């Protein structure tokens, strides 16, 4: 199985656990004289079984990420950490740029009101955000490509 397929299965398992949790909660109690819509015990057993499958998948995915290298020589684990850092950096730069340009609505209605000035270079921040966004897209393409090429480890 390819790493990408395992990632899809992990996502499906996580979604299934969430759905089962909701169904268990909805059927954990019922009113006297009525029957629950579903057997909460059976739903709970299914959720526990799905969690065991999920745990096995996560272990194999993490092993694969640690052992798989991207074309640039970094491990998948390092590339994933880099991607998260790039995402956080991009969000920070965009937020700072928006705040510096007054995107939150700091305008003057009267000439007697105080003028607001930007403490940060908006154009430079936007340029840096664009560069980071490009790096992020390129790295994400490498990661996705490798996900479909790498075999899932045991």
Protein language model regions, located:
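Structural preference for solvent-exposed beta-strand-turn elements
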Residues: 1-154
């Amino acid at each position: 199985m390819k790493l990408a397929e395992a990632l899809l299965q992990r996502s499906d398992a996580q979604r299934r656990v969430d759905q089962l949790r909701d169904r268990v909660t909805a059927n954990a109690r019922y009113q006297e004289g009525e029957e629950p819509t579903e057997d909460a015990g059976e739903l709970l057993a299914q959720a526990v079984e799905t969690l065991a499958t999920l745990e096995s998948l996560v272990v194999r995915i993490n092993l694969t990420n640690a052992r798989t290298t991207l074309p640039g020589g970094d491990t998948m684990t390092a590339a994933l950490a880099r991607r998260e850092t790039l995402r956080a950096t991009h969000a920070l730069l965009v937020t700072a740029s928006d705040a510096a340009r007054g995107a939150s609505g700091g305008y003057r209605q009267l000439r007697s009101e105080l003028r607001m000035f930007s403490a940060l270079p908006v154009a430079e921040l936007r340029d840096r955000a664009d560069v980071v966004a490009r790096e992020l897209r390129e790295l994400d393409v490498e990661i996705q490509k490798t996900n479909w090429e790498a075999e899932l480890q045991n």
